[in-house]
A protein has these predicted regions:
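Short alpha-helical
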Residues: 16-17, 42, 67
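Thiol/disulfide oxidoreductase modules built on the thioredoxin-like
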Residues: 48-55
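Polytopic alpha-helical membrane proteins, predominantly small-molecule transporters/carriers
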Residues: 69-72
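Local sequence-structure signature of Cys/Sec-based thiol-disulfide redox active-site neighborhoods
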Residues: 1-30
Length: 81
């Protein structure tokens, strides 16, 4: 299913919850642009500035943050599959 949403997934190297989300997306053929806060200081600053906290995984949907791996997966199932 195509989406008209602007999406960005914020992750961190070694984060098990990020891996869970990324595995779900890959298993379902869904590609979302990623920003890794471990290697990209600008991504980390954006995550904090817009989302208000340094928590990953975080899916920005049209500029609004969605936290928690289970919530991100549920949103993807509903809107992207």
């Amino acid at each position: 299913m195509a989406t008209d949403h602007e999406l960005t997934l914020y992750v961190m190297t070694g984060c098990p919850y990020c891996i869970k989300v990324k595995r779900f997306l890959a298993d379902n053929g869904v590609t979302i642009p990623e920003r890794n806060i471990s290697t990209d200081p600008d991504a980390e600053q954006t995550l904090i500035a817009v989302g208000g906290k340094r928590q990953v995984p975080c899916l920005f949907i049209d500029g609004k943050p969605l936290y928690e791996s289970s919530d991100i997966i549920a949103w993807a199932q509903e809107n992207l599959l």
